[in-house]
Amino acid sequence: MSRAVGIDLGTTNSVVAVLEGGEPNVIANAEGLRTTPSVVAFSRDGEVLVGDTAKRQAVTNVDNTISSVKRHIGTDWTKQIGDKKYTPQEISARILSKLKRDAEQYLGEKVTDAVITVPAYFNDAERQATKEAGEIAGLNVLRIINEPTAAALAYGLDKGKEDELILVFDLGGGTFDVSLLEVGKDDDFSTIQVRATSGDNRLGGDDWDQRIIDWLVDDFRKTTGVDLSSDKIAMQRLREASEQAKKELSSATSANIQLPYISLTESGPVNMDTTITRAQFEKMTEDLLERTKNPFRDVLKEAGVSVDKISHVVLVGGSTRMPAVSDLVKRETGKEPNKGVNPDEVVAVGAALQAGVLRGERKDVLLIDVTPLSLGIETKGGIMTKLIERNTAIPTKRSEVFTTAEDNQPSVSIQVFQGERELTQDNKNLGTFELTGIAPAPRGLPQIEVTFDIDANGIVHVSAKDKGTGKEQSMTITGGSGLSQDEIDRMIKEAEEHAAEDKNRRARVDQKNQAEQMVYTAEKLIGDNAKVNEEAKKELQADIDSLKSAIQADDHDLIKAGTDKLLASQQKFAQSVYETTKDDPKEQVVDAEVVDEDSGSSK
């Protein structure tokens, strides 16, 4: 039976976890690390690099390296690489494919199913696009769940026997969410219900990094007169240095940034050597921190809960390691945030638990999530008429009857929106469809029943029915990406083809490594056996030289032929070694017993 995994597809890093014996375990990647950078690069020879290998070469391959793609998921953003345009789904699928491969390598069996997490405040387009990315990667996406919900699931199951409120403060690399969850306990069963959620999909650790970058560029311009902002390679180096400085400032009061040869002027190379203090960093990012307060207060207001009712505060996302963030949470809640969870891993652990629940491996928990934004349709005057309010538990289904605005109106256009504003022009348009064939009648007489159905993934299905004629029309919101099933199928096929290419490339590398090892062994064999006749040595050396040339030329067929030939001549040489040893009296083996001198007994 194939396995199901939980995946935290993050802006900066991604993590995969699995249930083993009913307990979640984070899987280390092929490089031995428990987190994988969400970075994809296309090398000059056509190889696709993902994770640490992609991140390490970013400075020398800026134009073909993509990071933080999660910030574009569900939009029409594309990245031109060579003669091909890549969508956020395709880039995300590369990351998911690596996590899938690493999990399969660890488990020793196929991984087909996955629960993938998204920020709680992701809209329908972003959720649908994430699901598509999973499909392109060859995964059956069992469920899309919210990151704070997953974190609460991982954290809340082992917390006592009482009903408790858990506040999850999730500040990742590119998104921010706050969720309030209620954990209900009943003997050996837990119910985790989201009471309210809020957030900002354009706020994350990347924004803190950018403030350091801007400061460095400005400071360098003032001190040297050199503007680095148009130098792509310099900016990539600044980006990496800024991220590192941010991390250092979580535990130190200052960080030194040294970047030799950052630029070249008429006078020669220019170096960067500067220090940023934690106080400076917190001052330049205080407005970003301020933006986290309103979502926190909105959640308490939505749930009708006072702050003193919160039992636990959980910090999620690597950005919560910044002292200013944890201090703010402590001030706002009056509680010390829990330090017992790994903010980088807890979301993937929760996703693995949910995968176990959906596969029947865990039967002790029920997860009830909510829709983060209100859903409705446009009515006369551009009014946003809500059918499903935000923070409604999902899955859910709601219907409402509308009528025509004009006499003898033959059709109605159903425009679906998501958001909290009063006018549709200020909300997110999810799609439009027509209900035709309405019988001629005075305005206000026809009855058009509009139904919204949100599934457990938070993905929206809408239908409209003329109650008079029985005519019905429906649509599933396919996301802002607008990918058709044919396009998704094409991308899946391309991903499969690429997987085969990767497999062949790895096989060629393995073959080359094996050939180099064989050359080393054969050369050592000659060196260790000087007494073997010269003819045998010459024959083996000729095959060694031939294989070396094939390796140098990187010719797959020549390496294979050369390896086979060297193996045969190596065996022949070994036979000559044996014959030489047999003829040499000094090398002959003497059979004897070992005698114990103390007892005189033989052994």
Swiss-Prot record:
Xref: InterPro entries: ATPase_NBD, Chaperone_DnaK, Heat_shock_70_CS, HSP70_C_sf, HSP70_peptide-bd_sf, Hsp_70_fam
Induction conditions: By stress conditions e.g. heat shock.
Source superkingdom: Bacteria
Region feature Disordered, mapped onto this chain: 578-603
GO molecular function: ATP binding; ATP-dependent protein folding chaperone; unfolded protein binding
Acidic residues biased stretches: 593-603
Ranges annotated as biased composition (Basic and acidic residues): 580-589
Positions carrying Phosphothreonine: 175
Keywords of this entry: ATP-binding, Chaperone, Nucleotide-binding, Phosphoprotein, Stress response
CDD domains listed in its UniProt record: ASKHA_NBD_HSP70_DnaK-like
SUPFAM superfamilies in UniProt: Actin-like ATPase domain, Heat shock protein 70kD (HSP70), peptide-binding domain
Job description of the protein: Acts as a chaperone.
Family under the similarity heading: Belongs to the heat shock protein 70 family.
Protein name: Chaperone protein DnaK
Name of the coding gene: dnaK
